[in-house]
Regions:
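Conserved alpha/beta-hydrolase catalytic His-Asp/Glu region
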Residues: 2-57
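Conserved Class I S-adenosyl-L-methionine
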Residues: 37-38, 59, 98, 104
Length: 121
């Protein structure tokens, strides 16, 4: 198991979730460990050097902006900024969520999506 995998998993999930879900830990760790690390690091470099020059203000569709409360990769502040730029957007912060709250907090994420879709049909 690579140190990089362990670090990523600690950023993406709460300690409690990882303790209670060892199979998920092993599966995702295995996927990360099987990655070509040179390519993996090149992709991460894109995130670091990325210029925020998208035309988000041109988005006309109703948009759900969502992040986990404890996500250090897609922070609440980043999501608030995006929510302010996209005119028809709604911000949802998933309580206790980290980067992969779609897995760890699946019920909350799914409910937020369902509520957003139901409200905007």
């Amino acid at each position: 198991e690579l140190k990089l995998s362990r670090q990523a998993l600690k950023r993406w999930f709460s300690d409690k979730y990882l303790e209670n879900n060892p199979d998920t830990y092993k599966k995702i760790s295995s996927i990360l460990s099987a990655n070509n690390m040179a390519n993996f690091l090149r992709v991460y470099e894109l995130f670091v050097k990325h210029k925020n020059d998208e035309d988000f203000e041109k988005i006309q569709s109703k948009t759900l902006v969502m992040t986990g409360e404890h996500d250090i990769g897609s922070t609440i502040e980043m999501s608030q900024q995006l929510n302010n730029i996209i005119k028809n957007s709604e911000l949802k912060i998933i309580k206790d969520g980290k980067h992969l709250c779609g897995i760890e907090c699946a019920d909350d994420v799914n409910l937020a999506i369902k509520n957003f879709v139901d409200k905007n049909e």
